[in-house]
Structure formats: structure tokens, C-alpha cells
Amino acid sequence: MKHFLLFIFLFSISLVSHAQNETQKLALLNSAKYFEIKSRANYTQAILKAKENGWPIRYKSKNNASVNLVGIDAFGQPKYLTTFADPIQAITINTNKVWPGGGLGFNLTGATDIMTNKLSIWDEGVPRPTHVEFGGKVVEKDNATKIVSHSTHVAGIMFSKGSNQLAKGMAYGIKGAYSYDWFDDESEMAAAAANGLLVSNHSYGNVAGWNFNDDSTRWEYNGKWNEKEDFKFGYYDDGAQAMDSIAFNASNYLIVKSAGNSRTSTGPKVGDTYWRRDENGKWYDAGKRPDSLSSNNAYETLPMDVNAKNILTVGAVQGIAAGYSKKEDAIMTSFSSWGPTDDGRIKPDIVTDGQSVYSTTNNNDSS
């Protein structure tokens, strides 16, 4: 899926950062404390229920995507986050046109002092801190220690300095950026916004509908025990409400989230074995898949907080080598999730290249 935005980011580089007024700042700090207490209590309850019901704390799904238990939802079901694959390219989104020599005269790179530590990444773990492309730029803020390939890949898209020109980041000149893991993200986002954060990227989201559990080698259906379509698609949940609350009180802060990859995670063939949860939340072998279960491969496949109203939700199109010039150039990827939301809003907000993008990895300091 779509990792990073940014013509929007580079546009915000040109803005003067106005401090939050005191009322907004207080509201954000109060929200940060509330979200922290709520998140940690919810996670503690989720761990207890996981032991009771045999829920995995962590596993791998197809394409080696990481999946983590982070809480329980309003219906008492486990809430998992998963990484979304493949970020964007500068040519497709036309970011290269606002760089020096890009033809528009903006000469934007992110190098201005006002942008230092105004950009942040929330992800599964930590970007490789010694990587040649951004070593010394990334400040880890929440004591996360696990170096993760996905996080390193996203960081490269955002601000690789361009030692390898093919992997040059959108804001390649930025002097400093923050990094957080995905636990307690709402609390951390509110606190960071109170301190002047301008842009954050979140290339992960909630597991919904069908998901292949690589560790258990089985297809799992994540809908409620008695439903044929997962309600989480298009649903405005408390996570979406939290995002909107933060954005409302931080008018200069842009939250960027991936739309998701649900349209190719369609479950087993009709008649093949699948698993789902019973009314108590325990996984069981549900036998042969009936043809009545949704394949989540059409419209309304955006999961939960991606449906927030005041964030930028980014979908994925195929890369456009020559750059975008007309609408026919943009061809949707087969995997990227689509709206609308349950209340009829159009999502995602924008689309850009999200397929097989070249960027940094955590294999070594120059990979």
C-alpha cells in the first residue's frame, strides 16, 4: 500500500509553523493522557483475553506482513494491526517537480530549520538508525528497539538523502525526524501535535475481513461470528474518532494513513477450509467456505480508523514512469482498498504509486 504522500508534505515545508493556541494545546495534552490510559488498560485486557481464547499476540500473514495484537474492539473482539506494503515514488506523485531543478521554482527539500523534527513516522518498529541514507536523522521517541525492514523502507521513501539516487526520499534534505512504534499511537500523536508536529505517516492499519495466517497456514475470517461481511469495513470506530479529535485540535497537523490492501486478500476458494471465531471469540475450524461470505474485493473495503474525516487517506495506483499528465495514466492496483465509507463519504482522498517501489531495507547500512 501507499506509504507516503507527498506533494502535501513538501507543500507544508513552505508553511510557517504557527504554534497551537493554549486552548488547543491543553486539549491535545489532555487527550494524550486520556488515550494513554485507555490504550494501556485496553491492551492489558486484550492480553488476558488472548490467554483465555488462544489469540496469537503476533504472527505473520501473507507477503510476510507483520500482525500484532494491540487491543480489543467495542464488541470484545481482538484488534490487530498489520503493515501495509509498498510506498510511493517521486515521479508518479510529481514531488520531483518541487525539488531544485524541478521546473516549478520551489526548490523544496525539507532542509529548512523550521522542518527539523516536524515530520514523524509511526510504524511496526524502528528504521535502521545507522543506514547511510538517513543515519543520524531519525530520533526514536518511545523507546522502541526492534529494527524493522518495513519501518526502514518507509523511512527511506520519506527522507533518504539520495546516496543512491534511485532511492532518494521525498524530503531528502530534512535534518531530523521522529520515529515511534505503533503501540499507543493515538496518545503519542496527540502529544507530538501539541509540541508542533506537522506531518505523520502511518503505513499500517486494522486487520479486517479475510487474512491468511502464515504461522498457522490457514485462511481466517475476521468478521463477527454471525455475519457474512466484516462490519469493520467502512466503519467509523473509536480510532477514527480519535484521529479526528487530534486533527481538529491541531489544525496545522496532517495525519497520513494508508488505505489498506484488502482487495486481494479474498479468502480461500468456496468449498475450501477456513477458520473463524465463535461468539466467545475463540478460533475454530469452520469447515468449508460457503459462497455467501464476502470476499472483500470490491467497494467499501477501508478498515476502521482509515475512515476518519480529517486525515489524508492514500490509495495505490500503478507506477507512472513518465509522470502523471492525464487521468488515463492512473491505473488502480489490484490490492488497494476502496471506499466509500458507511456514511457515504468518498475515500481514499488521493492515490499515488504504491507498487514495487525501490527503497531502503534493514539488511545492512547500505541496502
Model regions: which residues?
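Active-site-adjacent substrate-recognition loops and nearby beta-strands
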Residues: 109-111, 240, 258-309, 315-347, ...
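Short, acidic/small-residue loops that bind anionic groups at enzyme active sites
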Residues: 224, 244, 254
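N-terminal domain-start motif of subtilase-like serine proteases
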Residues: 27-31, 36-121, 139-147, 184-185, ...
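Bacterial Sec-dependent N-terminal signal peptides
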Residues: 1-26
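Subtilisin-like serine protease catalytic core
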Residues: 20-22, 92-200, 205-217, 248-254, ...
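Flexible, solvent-exposed coil segments and beta strand-coil junctions
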Residues: 96, 222-223, 326
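A solvent-exposed, charged loop/short amphipathic helix patch at secondary-structure junctions
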Residues: 207-234, 238, 274-290, 367
